[in-house]
Amino acid sequence: MKHIVKHIHFVGIGGAGMSGIAEVLVNLGYEVSGSDLSRNAVTDRLQALGARIAIGHDAVNIEGANAVVVSTAVRSDNPEVLAARAKRVPIVQRAVMLAELMRLKQGIAIAGTHGKTTTTSLVASVLAAGGLDPTFVIGGRLISAGANARLGTGDFIVAEADESDASFLNLYPVIEVITNIDADHMDTYGHDFARLKQAFIEFTQRLPFYGSAVVCVDDPNVRQIIPFISKPVVRYGLSPDAQVRAEDIDARDGRMHFTVIRDGRAPLAVVLNMPGLHNVQNALAAIAIATDLGVSDDAIQLALAEFNGVGRRFQRYGEVPAADGGQYTLIDDYGHHPVEMAATIAAARGAFPGRRLVLAFQPHRYTRTRDCFDDFVNVLSTVDALVLTEVYAAGEAAISTANGDALSRALRTVGKVDPVFVATVDDVPDALAKVAQNGDVVITMGAGSIGGVPAKVAQHTQQKA
């Protein structure tokens, strides 16, 4: 590719999916430019690495580019897309560019409705501990690396495979992971769950004859597609028929202690430096891959015990002063689907038994809120106190029956929690100052702009002091 394409431009370079690919390309020696609507830590990092960053979208930004990379979130009338089309500069989907990177190495693609980012991070960390020095492209910041991407010298590239727009069907990895299959992004599949499951089957058909599908048999929908997978399958999970399974699971001090049982191998005692049964499952996927690739048990144990997590995945911000005196524990999480939220809430209950749980939640997308409305009501009703914001639209038109006010009314009707509704995330710090008490566990949660709230909460409490 490099002898033809030397300058690659990214429209929306600050996004989680785009920035990782851009960083790897910079490190491969390509000239990289990109644009986004605002600066953030990601664009600053890319600029420091040598990428040319423009704030705002303008036709002039693509000057000299041999290819323009877009995600499905980029509109067709974007001025840079229009300019590329007028100049006959190839417009490349993000997943297609990721597929090109996978052609340079042996790809390990992590798919599933939930858990992709954490599982990808765990796989990359365990392989790195085993001396395989993988390249990785992750949808969140791997805290130990301080970045969401890295160019390694080893043979493998570990990356997330995105089913939300069916773009994972562009990838041809040698190892695939399927964590779970759930009803999300159903617009892509015509609101037909059978089509979604069929897409995952087609994903496994991208494997070569020597490849393998590493699948979580705890998920009933994953279990249903196994008979239709024509390539070798490695089953992991908590189920008795899992080839890589966890037993004797014990949650202590925010960590998960368990024993790994693998066919033909001695039991392996593991301490995972993360809470939650769902993270035990994610770790089992990494253990299955690492075992297959010859990583030593000592390296597996070390990597999982020292895993520092991923940005916005149960990320701890420490203790924050409470208005009534004392302090509360502040955690931030990316969860935005009811299944993910339930797993995070369960992890928090397990990590902090007996403590009051306060959730500040920003729903993400009106269509998701509409499609999962009852499930949102059910999961939000399980917390002890709730601050709820208006829906983060993500470019969608508002739906009056699926907005924050409608969700608040439904929650009050159920009567298990009385939400404090705020119009914007800017109001969350004030709301939390009134709600959070000494000894509470406070979680800010959502895939939108609420990710900036924890830093503001800390600043807010300092100003009040």
Curated annotation (Swiss-Prot):
It is found in: Cytoplasm. ATP binds at G112, T113, H114, G115, K116, T117, T118. GO terms for cellular component: cytoplasm. Its EC number is 6.3.2.8. InterPro entries: Mur-like_cat_sf, Mur_ligase_C, Mur_ligase_C_dom_sf, Mur_ligase_cen, Mur_ligase_N, MurCDEF_pg_biosynth, UDP-N-AcMur_Ala_ligase_MurC. One of its GO terms (biological process) is cell wall organization. Keywords: ATP-binding, Cell cycle, Cell division, Cell shape, Cell wall biogenesis/degradation, Cytoplasm, Ligase, Nucleotide-binding, Peptidoglycan synthesis. GO terms for molecular function: ATP binding; UDP-N-acetylmuramate-L-alanine ligase activity. Belongs to the MurCDEF family. This is UDP-N-acetylmuramate--L-alanine ligase.
